[in-house]
Regions:
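Membrane-embedded alpha-helical segments of integral membrane proteins
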Residues: 55-101
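Transmembrane alpha-helices and immediately adjacent membrane-cytoplasm interface residues
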Residues: 94-105, 115-142, 148
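Membrane-helix interfacial "entry" motifs
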Residues: 33-46, 71-83, 104-109, 113
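Membrane-anchoring/interfacial helices and their immediately flanking loops
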Residues: 17-20, 24-69
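Short extracytoplasmic/periplasmic juxtamembrane "stem" segments immediately C-terminal to an N-terminal membrane anchor
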Residues: 83, 140-156
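Lipid-exposed faces of alpha-helical membrane segments in multi-pass integral membrane proteins
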Residues: 48-60, 89-93, 115, 119-125
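Extracytosolic and intramembrane catalytic regions of membrane-associated proteins
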Residues: 158-286
């Protein structure tokens, strides 16, 4: 999260950039006798503000899309709604306020611009935080279905009980594929059912039952369905799958699929029909 939120601090350089256009140094700006941004029109000031805001938002968006929510998880996990709010506040409203209040040589202009920059920085930091804590951290195979598990779905106490040290902390660079492996003893299974009913937690949110997907690939093939028959039935799923096949050069007969439950509905995970290797994710119908 820190990488994205560092962009927020750059909002405070708006004033410095405006002043630099008229030859005022950052040190000189501490002298209240020097009017800020003399000679700039409000349209120029708003345009500079817009460019800076757009650059900062683009940096935060890049990290969000490439690291925390790799395609197609951004739309599947509802990230687009928050993005709209962030863009509205950080890229649109800030420069509009500058357009309204800016007047070259206006007393108190430096303070006004500082307040706008602070407001935008706070909005960006808050948005980054929300996106960070709601990011998908594991894609869990349980029985014949994958499910996205978000950072705020897991308790620290439950993470600490994971048998594999790799699953005792939340991934920072995108979701990790894992599988749920339950004991075969019926008594233990009944105890797990009783525990989940009492705690209200589902098994996919209990990392102590996680194993690496690599250990589960062969079994995943037996739990999957052939892609070719599904393609022949048509529909949105077939359209998305056909698009992937055309772009990748893969054959439908070489692939199987397993349903993927996301916040916005059911998508699919395509796997190699022989090895069980993950090939790609198909988004749900939105």
């Amino acid at each position: 999260m820190s990488s994205a939120c560092l962009y927020a601090s750059r909002q405070f350089h708006i004033i410095v950039v405006l002043a630099a256009n008229i030859g005022i140094t950052e040190h000189q700006m501490t002298d209240t006798t020097i009017p800020i941004a003399r000679g700039l029109t409000r349209w120029q000031a708003s345009g500079i503000h817009l460019l800076i805001s757009a650059a900062i938002a683009a940096g935060a968006l890049f990290i969000t899309l490439r690291v925390w929510y790799p395609p197609p998880l951004f739309t599947a996990e509802g990230g687009s709604e928050l993005l709209f709010i962030l863009v509205a506040v950080d890229v649109v409203i800030g420069p509009l306020i500058t357009l309204v209040i800016f007047k070259s040589g206006k007393p108190g202009l430096r303070f006004d611009l500082s307040v706008i920059a602070l407001f935008q920085a706070c909005a960006l930091v808050y948005g980054c935080h929300v996106m960070f804590v709601a990011r998908p951290v594991f894609i869990v195979l349980a029985m014949d279905q994958f499910e996205t598990v978000r950072a705020n779905d897991l308790d620290a106490a439950d993470l600490a009980q994971a048998p594999d040290p790799a699953f005792r902390s939340l991934p920072l660079t995108g979701p990790v594929f894992v599988a749920v492996e339950l004991p075969k003893d019926m008594k233990q299974l009944r105890e797990i059912i009783a525990e989940t009913q009492k705690s209200g937690k589902i098994v996919t949110h209990l990392p102590r039952y996680y194993v690496s997907y690599a250990q589960h690939k062969t079994k995943a093939v037996t739990q999957s369905r052939a892609l070719d028959p599904a393609m022949k039935r048509g529909g949105d799923f077939a359209t998305l799958a056909q698009k992937f096949l055309a772009e990748s050069g893969r054959k439908a007969s070489d692939l199987n699929y397993i349903e993927l439950q996301t916040r916005r509905g059911f998508g699919a995970v395509l796997i190699d029909a022989k090895s069980g290797e993950i090939v790609t994710l198909l988004p749900p119908k939105l």
